[in-house]
Amino acid sequence: MTNYDQHHALQSLTLGKPTPYRERYDPSLLQAVPRALNRDLLGLQATALPFHGADIWTLYELSWLNDAGIPQVAIGEIALNATSTNLIESKSFKLYLNSLNQTSFPSREAVRVRLAEDLSRCADGEVQVVLRALSDFTSSPLLDFDGECIDDQPIHIDDYTFTNRYLEGAAGGSVVSETLVSHLLKSNCLITHQPDWGSVQIRYRGARIDREALLRYLVSFRQHNEFHEQCVERIFCDVMQFCRPETLTVYARYTRRGGLDINPWRSNTHFSPATGRLARQ
């Protein structure tokens, strides 16, 4: 369990509270969560992070009015750099996007620029924004993570309390380069404790990681309360600490909530994430 869910930085969040919807553009709806809350517990310093990466958001419910008052729609893709001071709280992001619904913009590019400015200000870091037409997705198939799925092992699990000790001694033997995948990642929102469902891809070069130990570790997140981004950084740090791979990439894609999905990745090597939807997205 985390020990910062009552931190003063979280007390003003709209998450978990009844909140009215604004009908006009209002960037003040965006709320930031300091990344330092969980990074301090992991022993990470902003000036010497052991990884690079991004939080990739997909915005499925994005609409505004053009100058003629006709509603416009697009699908947004947001990449929030992992070096930003803050992550963006998802409910506030949804409320902010809804505030665009009855607001006029002269062009899609004007919307993109406004999103980039507002999100960068909230996150205190680099944010890339792409807005795509719905027609761009008509021929886009569902994807699956590359790699070996470790979910169908003949093991018994009866403890769902989070612990990274499952990874102690989990790596050994010859050096391999491989990619392991699990679709059984489930954690809970830090504030509301609502379930967050995800698939995770772990790509590494190093001593071979025991599949059973890794699966038990991932399943132990099942009753753990943290935001998506924080879980991915915890997985990265735990695998690095106990398995000591030469290179490591952790990439998770979570199911959507409120018209948004969040897909964080962290890596200490070159990595270009595939951004297509998985089956549950």
Curated annotation (Swiss-Prot):
<dbReference type="GO" id="GO:0033739">
    <property type="term" value="F:preQ1 synthase activity"/>
</dbReference>
<feature type="active site" description="Proton donor">
    <location>
        <position position="196"/>
    </location>
</feature>
<dbReference type="InterPro" id="IPR050084">
    <property type="entry name" value="NADPH_dep_7-cyano-7-deazaG_red"/>
</dbReference>
<dbReference type="GO" id="GO:0006400">
    <property type="term" value="P:tRNA modification"/>
</dbReference>
<dbReference type="GO" id="GO:0005737">
    <property type="term" value="C:cytoplasm"/>
</dbReference>
<feature type="binding site">
    <location>
        <begin position="228"/>
        <end position="229"/>
    </location>
    <ligand>
        <name>substrate</name>
    </ligand>
</feature>
<keyword id="KW-0671">Queuosine biosynthesis</keyword>
<comment type="function">
    <text>Catalyzes the NADPH-dependent reduction of 7-cyano-7-deazaguanine (preQ0) to 7-aminomethyl-7-deazaguanine (preQ1).</text>
</comment>
<feature type="binding site">
    <location>
        <begin position="90"/>
        <end position="91"/>
    </location>
    <ligand>
        <name>NADPH</name>
    </ligand>
</feature>
<dbReference type="InterPro" id="IPR029500">
    <property type="entry name" value="QueF"/>
</dbReference>
<comment type="pathway">
    <text>tRNA modification; tRNA-queuosine biosynthesis.</text>
</comment>
<protein>
    <recommendedName>
        <fullName>NADPH-dependent 7-cyano-7-deazaguanine reductase</fullName>
        <ecNumber>1.7.1.13</ecNumber>
    </recommendedName>
</protein>
<dbReference type="GO" id="GO:0008616">
    <property type="term" value="P:queuosine biosynthetic process"/>
</dbReference>
<comment type="subunit">
    <text>Homodimer.</text>
</comment>
<feature type="binding site">
    <location>
        <begin position="88"/>
        <end position="90"/>
    </location>
    <ligand>
        <name>substrate</name>
    </ligand>
</feature>
<feature type="active site" description="Thioimide intermediate">
    <location>
        <position position="189"/>
    </location>
</feature>
<dbReference type="Pfam" id="PF14489">
    <property type="entry name" value="QueF"/>
</dbReference>
<comment type="similarity">
    <text>Belongs to the GTP cyclohydrolase I family. QueF type 2 subfamily.</text>
</comment>
<keyword id="KW-0963">Cytoplasm</keyword>
<keyword id="KW-0560">Oxidoreductase</keyword>
<feature type="binding site">
    <location>
        <begin position="257"/>
        <end position="258"/>
    </location>
    <ligand>
        <name>NADPH</name>
    </ligand>
</feature>
<dbReference type="InterPro" id="IPR016428">
    <property type="entry name" value="QueF_type2"/>
</dbReference>
<keyword id="KW-0521">NADP</keyword>
<dbReference type="Pfam" id="PF14819">
    <property type="entry name" value="QueF_N"/>
</dbReference>
<dbReference type="InterPro" id="IPR029139">
    <property type="entry name" value="QueF_N"/>
</dbReference>
<dbReference type="InterPro" id="IPR043133">
    <property type="entry name" value="GTP-CH-I_C/QueF"/>
</dbReference>
